[in-house]
């Protein structure tokens, strides 16, 4: 399923096999289509052209709309959105704890009010697994609690202990669902999630415990939620030695181009983030020289592509001046072109990281780009 084919320090070059789409080359950036669509008018066919290997959709949102039962009746998420590559679905836990209101947490799960219409919903480990089974994703994420930052130590400890018990229940229900004769995807995999807030001892203890459960991969969750970047890196460095070396490692919700490079340097294989699409919709674009705001007046007569070093469909066809005009005119096309460029950049970044690992020069790549890509131009 997962094979490390080369290492440089902690950085890993790997291959990951899925039921859909064959082999994924890692490190990989997963393109976020929360509601089975990329915000900005980008469809599944565009994703192929943009170099996407894995698409990520959200259990919470799809459960509310259109309903996971609808997706199941349509043949699963792959058929529903016409995407033939791998799909990862997150468990809904993060959204329950960040979007929903009036939450009540018990050992069984969480009762909360929908952010759409306020109706009461219960979600626990079994419910999350059933929803993700209906969606038929390649990778299902375990149901967990993502605590607020900062979190009190005692609460973080109780929470990660409960998340461990929830993972055991997720695993049992996931195995049961995969064995059903009418399973949408009987080969669906399950990833466990490490929690523990910013406390290294809790993080290490929790990772040691969940590693005993036979999951197909493991994620580090609960980061990039307001803690300083150096704290995030410290937690990754503390947890990584306890993550099974023969299974993929996923850093959830991260992050900037520099974060991805630094995450790879610390042994991470999978990344996802809404940043490329979200920033794009506000005119903030990534280039190999740093980040730019295409709305700036200095680009009004600039006939160069967004990034002369980029060969994405947007940079091959349109000028900075034109894209700036689209934003000024509030044309929907502005969002589509900007999102396409940023997603291509992120997918290309992952490819260049893989290429540097193949060539044995990842540290050179890291030195050249980790800081540069954080600059504003």
Please give the residue ranges for each predicted region.
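Non-catalytic, usually N-terminal nucleic-acid engagement modules in DNA/RNA processing proteins
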Residues: 1-184, 297-300
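Conserved, mostly hydrophobic/aromatic
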Residues: 22, 55, 90, 132, ...
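A non-catalytic, amphipathic alpha-helix used as a structural packing/dimerization or gating element
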Residues: 127, 131, 135, 158-169, ...
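Structural signal for hydrophobic packing residues in well-ordered secondary-structure cores
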Residues: 136, 167, 171-174, 178, ...
């Amino acid at each position: 399923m997962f094979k490390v084919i080369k290492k440089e320090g902690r950085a890993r070059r790997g291959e990951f096999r899925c039921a859909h789409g064959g082999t994924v080359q890692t490190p990989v950036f997963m393109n976020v289509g929360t509601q089975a669509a990329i915000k900005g008018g980008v469809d599944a066919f565009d994703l192929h052209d943009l170099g996407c290997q894995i698409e990520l959709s959200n259990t919470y949102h799809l459960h509310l709309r259109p309903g996971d039962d609808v997706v199941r009746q349509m043949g699963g998420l792959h058929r529903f959105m016409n995407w033939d590559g791998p799909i990862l679905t997150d468990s809904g836990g993060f959204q329950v704890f960040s979007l929903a209101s009036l939450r009540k947490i018990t050992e069984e799960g969480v009762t909360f009010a929908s952010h759409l219409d306020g109706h009461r919903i219960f979600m626990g480990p079994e419910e999350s697994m059933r929803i993700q089974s209906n969606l038929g994703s390649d990778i299902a994420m375990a149901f967990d609690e993502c605590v607020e930052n900062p979190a009190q130590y005692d609460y973080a400890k109780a929470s990660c202990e409960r998340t461990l018990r929830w993972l055991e229940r997720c695993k049992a229900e996931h195995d049961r669902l995969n064995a059903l004769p009418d399973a949408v995807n009987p080969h669906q995999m399950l990833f466990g999630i490490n929690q523990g807030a910013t406390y290294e001892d809790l993080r290490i203890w929790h990772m040691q415990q969940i590693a005993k459960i036979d999951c197909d991969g493991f994620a580090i969750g609960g980061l990039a939620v307001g803690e300083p970047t150096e704290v995030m890196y410290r937690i990754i460095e503390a947890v990584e030695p306890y993550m099974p070396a023969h299974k993929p490692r996923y850093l959830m919700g991260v992050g900037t181009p520099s974060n991805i490079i630094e995450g790879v340097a610390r042994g991470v294989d999978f990344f996802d983030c809404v940043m490329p699409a979200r920033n794009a919709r506000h005119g903030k674009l990534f280039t190999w020289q740093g980040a730019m705001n295409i709305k700036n007046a200095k680009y009004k007569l600039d006939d160069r592509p967004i990034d002369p070093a980029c060969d994405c469909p947007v940079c091959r066809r349109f000028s900075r001046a034109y894209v700036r005009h689209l934003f000024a005119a509030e044309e929907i096309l502005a969002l589509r072109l900007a999102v396409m460029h940023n997603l291509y950049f992120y997918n290309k970044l992952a490819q260049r990281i893989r290429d540097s690992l193949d060539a044995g020069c990842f540290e050179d790549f890291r030195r050249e780009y980790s800081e540069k890509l954080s600059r504003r131009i």
